[in-house]
Each structure stands twice: as C-alpha cells, then as structure tokens.
C-alpha cells in the first residue's frame, strides 16, 4: 500500500488497466494531446502529519467567534434561539441522518411520519390547510410561491414590498427573470408597506402581492388592510412569515392569505454561518395540486393499519416535466426533522412562551434605547427586531461591540443605501437583561 487514502497496489492498477484493455496509465490518457498535458512537477508543500494537521486546523478554528462566547444581537433572517438538547440526539439517529427523501419512501415509515408531523405543525402555525415537506430555505420558498401564483393566475406581474427580506427579493428576481415575470417593488412608509403605493401598483395583470410578517425591519405588517388590496383584480396574497412569531401573532391564514411561506430556522436549526435552513410552504386547499415539492399523506394499508405515503406525486417534475409547478425535486428533510423535534419538545405553550420572551425582551431593549437618547426608527408594533439610527458607520460600532464580547446588529446600509448608519437589532429569548443593558450602555455612551 503506497498511500493510506489511495490504497490501490500496483497489482490492482494492472488488473484495472487490463480490464479496460490498455497496458499503462499513459495509454489510458493517450487521447489527450501532448501540448495540453502538464508535465512539470506540482509545487505542493510537504504533507502534514495527522497530528500536525489537527493542531493547525484547531488553531484556525479558534479564530471563530460564536454565540456561546458572544452575546448576539444579529438577526436579519438568522437568529440565535434556544435549541432543545434532544434535537441533535434524534436527528443523529442512523434512521434519520440524511438530508434526502428516500427513493422507496413507504419503507421508511418513521421518516415519512416525521415529515407528516412537520407539515401538520406548519399548518397549525400558519392557519393554512396544506403544507409541503419543506423547501430549501425561506427565500426559495417565497420565489416558488410567486411562480405558483403566476402560473395559476396566468399573469406576469409580482408586487413585493421592500420590507420583505432583501435577499429573498433577489432570489425572487432570479426566478422571475427566466420566466419573463416583472417584479415590482413597493416602497416602505415608516417601516411598513406603503398602502397608498400598493394600491397604485396592483392592477389586473398582478399575479400576487408579497409581504413579510413580521417584516425585515421587525415591524408587524397590517395584513388586515393589505389583504383586500392584494386580492383586487383576482391576484393572490402571499405572506412570508416568521414561524416563531406565529406563536403570538394572528396566523396569516386568518387574513385570507393564499400562500404562506417562511423559514423554520428559529426552531432547532443553528445559525451556522447562515445555513443550511429549512423553508416551509403552506397553501389553501384549492391550491393543493399546485404545491411544489413533496407531500406526505396519511393512509391505511390493506390490514387497516395507519401508514404514510408520498402523495399527489403527479404534480411533481419527475412526472409532469415542463408542466410541473416547480423543478424542485428534493427538500430539507433533516432540518425539517430538527424543526419538528424542537416544536414537539417545546409544545404549544413552550412556543408561545419563547415568542413572548422575544417580544418582551426586544421591547425592553427598545425602551432602554430611547431612554439612552438613541434614535429608534419606525416606532410601532414589532416582534423581536427594531432599528436604531447611529452617528457613525455600523461597521465601526460593531467592531467595538465585538471587543466587548457582543455581536452587533445588521448594517441596513448594506441593502438599503438610504439607511446608512442604521442598525437592525435582534433580541431573542437567549439574551439576558445584563446583556441587553450592556449593549444599550455601549451604544448610548458613544451617542453622547
């Protein structure tokens, strides 16, 4: 054996060459012209031993900063939430430890039941009739919802509020470009969708209106006022929602939304450099056969026992091909399982309690910011995020906060040029009063 990771012996190589009918490695690559072959020695450094490599990688990893060492006030779509210990134990079981839906699904009854429970809990949170097995993330779920709306209504205009996550809007534009769909953005007014601008933008050619709940600035959009505007001209109403916030807020289904999407990251999925996540997709019953992705249904076998199957597969691209709603042919089964385990471990009361803690702690932070003389923007109903205006660039402030053991908020100037020197602060249930007070004191001292 010449190499611990490439164990083929000379005898093995000769047997393989003989099997394919050549006598040497050079003969194997004879079809490659000599003038394009690289004949010099590769200048590669001497390999490190396993011990040396472990030491080197540990040294590099120690440069990372995480939310265990640092109090994080960074949100903007990825949040530092409580993760029940049981989540990792369950998803690490060999029966579940795959990100993929099995190709012989009915054999994997445990996996299908877990997905079915995920779908059920998403329906309970959103107030919708049907949910799929998951999508890649919240952004792709939103884009898929827009494509469904355009295909269902036969219209080519999507109206989306600028208070929707900017990265989700970019994903939407990418999807829309290939389908020749126009994406029109509606401006914000005091941190929520400008209703007058929305009325002027929606027309008979509008396939859907998309808003976020709570929106990117943390504000609670008035869905009751937006819904009739969205549905004028028979367009569809799409809501991108934070599932944890739905533990307290009225579910979008109560406001006659047609599609509710979002990201299940708040439930049992770590921030992990921004992914992977787990999108969810829920609809009314009339759109059941237009839903992208996989659907798990409950049934009975020939002996009358309860069982689970992948159902309504004729919708999917491996059968309908170009007529399918979507080309998605996978999901985030492992992360959906993590979300399911987290929601189950918390229970209904636990979800409500954590949502309430987010609301109360964020509002405490906002009130303390006002007392410290900081300028709080877009004041109004919120969930766990709010915006403050700073006297200097957010990057500079965050650098100082990091030195004090805190991860600062999101720099809104990165995606909203008009909001340069504005910070989006997220406060979750994991933040303590002492951590919040330390943040406000640091921000307030610099403000003075």
Curated annotation (Swiss-Prot):
Catalytic activity: N(6)-[(R)-lipoyl]-L-lysyl-[glycine-cleavage complex H protein] + glycine + H(+) = N(6)-[(R)-S(8)-aminomethyldihydrolipoyl]-L-lysyl-[glycine-cleavage complex H protein] + CO2
Gene Ontology biological-process entries: glycine decarboxylation via glycine cleavage system; nucleoside metabolic process
Family annotation (NCBIfam families): PRK00451.1 (NF001696)
Purpose of the protein: The glycine cleavage system catalyzes the degradation of glycine. The P protein binds the alpha-amino group of glycine through its pyridoxal phosphate cofactor; CO(2) is released and the remaining methylamine moiety is then transferred to the lipoamide cofactor of the H protein.
Complex formation: The glycine cleavage system is composed of four proteins: P, T, L and H. In this organism, the P 'protein' is a heterodimer of two subunits.
InterPro entries xref list: GcvPA (IPR023010), GDC-P_N (IPR049315), GDC_P (IPR020581), PyrdxlP-dep_Trfase (IPR015424), PyrdxlP-dep_Trfase_major (IPR015421), PyrdxlP-dep_Trfase_small (IPR015422)
Keywords associated with the record: Oxidoreductase
Keyword match Signal: no
Organism: Bacillus subtilis (strain 168)
Pfam families, per the entry: GDC-P
Enzyme nomenclature, EC number: 1.4.4.2
Family indicated by similarity: Belongs to the GcvP family. N-terminal subunit subfamily.
Gene that produces this protein: gcvPA
Protein name: Probable glycine dehydrogenase (decarboxylating) subunit 1
An annotated Gene Ontology molecular function: glycine dehydrogenase (decarboxylating) activity
First-tier enzyme category under EC: oxidoreductase
Keyword Heme attributed: no
């Amino acid at each position: 054996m010449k190499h611990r990771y490439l164990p083929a012996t000379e005898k093995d190589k000769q047997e393989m060459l003989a099997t394919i009918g050549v006598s040497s490695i050079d003969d194997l690559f004879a079809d490659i012209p000599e003038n394009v072959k690289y004949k010099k020695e590769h200048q590669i450094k001497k390999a490190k031993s396993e011990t040396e490599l472990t030491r080197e990688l540990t040294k590099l990893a120690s440069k990372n900063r995480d939310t265990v060492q640092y109090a994080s006030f960074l949100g903007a779509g990825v949040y530092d939430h409580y993760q029940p210990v049981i989540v990792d134990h369950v998803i690490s079981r060999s029966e579940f430890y795959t990100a993929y839906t099995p190709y012989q699904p009915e054999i994997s009854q445990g996996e299908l039941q877990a997905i079915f429970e995920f779908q059920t809990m998403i329906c309970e949170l959103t107030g919708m009739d049907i949910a799929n097995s998951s999508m890649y993330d919240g952004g792709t779920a939103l884009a898929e919802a827009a494509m469904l709306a355009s295909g269902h209504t036969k219209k080519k205009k999507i109206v989306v509020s600028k208070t929707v996550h900017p990265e989700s809007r970019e994903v939407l534009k990418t999807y829309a470009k290939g389908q020749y769909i126009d994406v029109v953005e509606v401006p914000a007014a005091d941190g929520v969708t400008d209703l007058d601008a929305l009325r002027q933008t929606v027309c008979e050619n509008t396939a859907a209106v998309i808003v976020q709940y709570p929106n990117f600035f943390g504000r609670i959009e008035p869905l009751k006022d937006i819904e009739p505007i969205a549905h004028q001209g028979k367009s569809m109403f799409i809501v991108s929602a934070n599932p944890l916030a739905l533990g307290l807020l009225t579910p979008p289904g109560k406001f006659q939304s047609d599609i509710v999407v979002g990201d299940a990251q708040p439930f049992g999925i770590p921030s992990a450099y921004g992914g992977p996540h787990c999108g969810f997709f829920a609809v009314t019953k009339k759109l059941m056969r237009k839903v992208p992705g996989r659907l798990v249904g409950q049934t009975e076998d020939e002996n009358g026992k309860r069982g689970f199957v992948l159902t309504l597969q004729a919708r999917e691209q491996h059968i309908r091909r170009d007529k399918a709603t979507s080309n998605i042919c996978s999901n985030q089964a492992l992360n959906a399982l993590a979300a399911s385990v987290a929601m189950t471990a918390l229970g209904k009361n636990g979800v409500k309690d954590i949502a309430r803690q987010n609301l109360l702690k964020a509002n405490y932070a906002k009130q303390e910011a006002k007392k410290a003389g900081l300028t709080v923007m877009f004041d109004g109903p919120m969930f766990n995020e709010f915006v403050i205006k700073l006297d200097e660039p957010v990057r500079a402030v965050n650098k100082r906060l990091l030195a004090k053991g805190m991860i600062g908020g999101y720099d809104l100037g990165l995606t909203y040029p008009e909001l340069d020197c504005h910070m989006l602060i997220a406060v979750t249930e994991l933040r303590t009063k002492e951590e919040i007070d330390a943040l406000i004191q640091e921000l307030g001292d610099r403000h003075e």
